Amino acid sequence: MFIQPTHTISITFDKENLSAKIYRNTGKSTSKITSINGNSKIQLSDGKYIIKTSSKSGSINENSTEFAVKGSDENISIKTEYSQKFMSSKINEYRSDISGVLFAKYPELKSSFILQKEIILGNNADWYAASYQRGVIDRNSGDTYTVILKKENNKWVIKTKPQIINTIYNTKDIPEDILSETTSRLSPFSTNS
């Protein structure tokens, strides 16, 4: 009798309180292997697998990640996105605090600009980004201005002035993954907000 060797697979989620089901994918069919809660280490033999991630609270969009085990241990990082329902809930919860901080420093945003999109980011829903476009005036270029805030010590702090382009060079103290996700999700061409 031949026993297939197994390898340690370390699965790490980018957010807390997530669970997942692991399926073996033979190409012809998939069969459930196990379920996990939170970051886990499991033993798997060589083959192709699918991890289907979810949250009991509905805070993330369900996510499928495919990976293969080929003769060695593997580290699998699972990146998830907040669900629209969760983001809407958090934005509504934070709106008055964010607006107070933002419009106190940049009153022209309230009077001369129109909010286009807003999102919640970060592993702990502690980043906020919004895009604004100048209201209807003769010189409206159509440019979109983005502003980013972070919740620090239970207070929202402005991390960027409203500007057209945010990069690692013209912003400080903003992780590259937050900048990248802000740019892709607030783009006027983005289908996921």
Regions found by a protein language model. Give the residues of each.
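A glycine-anchored, Pro-Gly-centered beta-turn/N-cap motif
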Residues: 38, 45-48, 152-154
